[in-house]
């Protein structure tokens, strides 16, 4: 019985072990079958996918613009300073006490406007004295002329000598000379009185007063009472390289006034527009430049004396010029070039000859034609014959977003 019991346990253990072994064998076989198709598919797809990625990776995004034909003005530029057309220091021409000022600091005045008054008392007294002396001498002259007339009648009958007649004639002439001197004295006294009223010699803007009412002033004071600057019109003096002189002279010979624009310090806002007035008569040998003067009406008071401005003078207009954005123009070992897009959005490098240009646009004199598309952004990622994706500019994009998109594009171009 004991032997039979042990045999049964042995059989049970063997069956259990066999069942476990069968389970693990079946499970492993199913896993290998399910993995094989995936591995085979991946092995089949990987080469093809890799080759396809090599052939058609992400296209480099670029921005483009079309070359257009238009009239382009040619400007000569220089740095300049605004100066008053006239600057006058108003001084007193007589000595005396300042009684009144008749202007507000900073106001515009006209020539002849009353600016200040000096105590006129002494000048009125002097005028009255000279007028009295003149009246006295006129009376003396009248009496001398009557005596001369009588002497002339008596001389005809020899009742007076020739010597007495000549003496009376001399007295009349002497008195006439005295009268002329008296008249000059009266005019001088009147002038001194007039000068006690100080008027504006020119139109312009008055500055800050240099003296207060009540002070004793004299004709020898160098500071004066106030300074007037004529700002309507106002002038601009700027410099140009000596190489531009021929261009300016040629433009002047055309007979039309040359337009000069005044721009602010940042060169972003036009302040006023005037015309060329004159060229200096010599070149500065130290700087190789020549001074140029322009005049502006300045009715809006946009320009002030000693103001620093950027000057632009229009000397010519180039008609039917091919124009592209300045950002499209590049410089390489072979010279200036642009990337041109064809109908399939493939790029090719074109050597060009640039002309007039500024911060926004440039004239292309040779190398491309109007209607050609040129790349303006994304240029650093281009190679000859590469196909690109033309995208629209997003002006609202923040600098951080632009940096991120550019880095992503570079990664895409390299992948």
Curated annotation (Swiss-Prot):
Residues 399-415 have a biased composition (Basic and acidic residues). The keyword Membrane applies. It is a peripheral membrane protein. The keyword Secreted does not apply. InterPro entries: CusB_D23, Multidrug-R_MdtA, RND_pump_MFP. It is found in: Cell inner membrane. GO terms for molecular function: efflux transmembrane transporter activity. Keywords: Cell inner membrane, Cell membrane, Membrane, Signal, Transport. Residues 1-21 form the signal peptide. It comes from the Bacteria. Induction: The mdtABC operon is transcriptionally activated by BaeR. It holds the Pfam family HlyD_D23. Residues 32-60, 392-415 are annotated as: Disordered. GO terms for cellular component: efflux pump complex; plasma membrane. Part of a tripartite efflux system composed of MdtA, MdtB and MdtC. The MdtABC tripartite complex confers resistance against novobiocin and deoxycholate. Belongs to the membrane fusion protein (MFP) (TC 8.A.1) family. PANTHER family: MULTIDRUG RESISTANCE PROTEIN MDTA. This is Multidrug resistance protein MdtA. It comes from Escherichia coli (strain 55989 / EAEC).
């Amino acid at each position: 019985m004991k032997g039979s019991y042990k045999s049964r346990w042995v059989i049970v253990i063997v069956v259990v072990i066999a069942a476990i072994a069968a389970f693990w064998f079946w499970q492993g076989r199913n896993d290998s079958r399910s993995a094989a198709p995936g591995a085979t598919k991946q092995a089949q797809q990987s080469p093809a996918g890799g080759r396809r990625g090599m052939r058609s990776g992400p296209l480099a995004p670029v921005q483009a613009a079309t070359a257009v034909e238009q009239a382009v003005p040619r400007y000569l530029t220089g740095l300049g300073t605004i100066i008053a057309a006239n600057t006058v220091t108003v001084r007193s021409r007589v000595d005396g006490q300042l009684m009144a000022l008749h202007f507000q600091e900073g106001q515009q005045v006209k020539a002849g406007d009353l600016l200040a008054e000096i105590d006129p008392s002494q000048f009125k007294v002097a005028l009255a004295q000279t007028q009295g002396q003149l009246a006295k001498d006129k009376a003396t002259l009248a009496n001398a002329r009557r005596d001369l007339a009588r002497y002339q009648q008596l001389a005809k009958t020899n009742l007076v000598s020739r010597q007495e007649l000549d003496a009376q004639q001399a007295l009349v002439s002497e008195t006439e000379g005295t009268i002329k001197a008296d008249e000059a004295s009266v005019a001088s006294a009147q002038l001194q009185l007039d000068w006690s009223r100080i008027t504006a010699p020119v139109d312009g803007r008055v500055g800050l007063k240099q003296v207060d009412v009540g002070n004793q002033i004299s004709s020898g004071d160098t500071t004066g009472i106030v300074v007037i600057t004529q700002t309507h019109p106002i002038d601009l003096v700027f410099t140009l390289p000596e190489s531009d002189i021929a261009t300016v002279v040629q433009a002047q010979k055309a007979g039309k006034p040359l337009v000069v624009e005044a721009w602010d310090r940042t060169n972003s806002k036009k302040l006023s527009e005037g015309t060329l007035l004159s060229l200096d008569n010599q070149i500065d040998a130290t700087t190789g430049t020549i001074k140029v003067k322009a005049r502006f009406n300045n009715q809006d008071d946009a320009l002030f004396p000693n103001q620093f401005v950027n000057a632009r003078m229009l000397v010519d207009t180039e008609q039917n010029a091919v124009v592209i954005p300045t950002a499209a123009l590049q410089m390489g070992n072979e010279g200036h070039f642009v990337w041109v897009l064809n109908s399939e959005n493939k790029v090719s490098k074109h050597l060009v000859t640039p002309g007039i240009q500024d911060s926004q646009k440039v004239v292309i004199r040779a190398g491309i034609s109007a209607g050609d598309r040129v790349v303006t952004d994304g240029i650093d990622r281009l190679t000859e014959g590469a196909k690109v994706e033309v995208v629209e500019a997003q002006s609202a994009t923040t600098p951080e977003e632009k940096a991120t998109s550019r880095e992503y594009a570079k990664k895409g171009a390299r992948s």
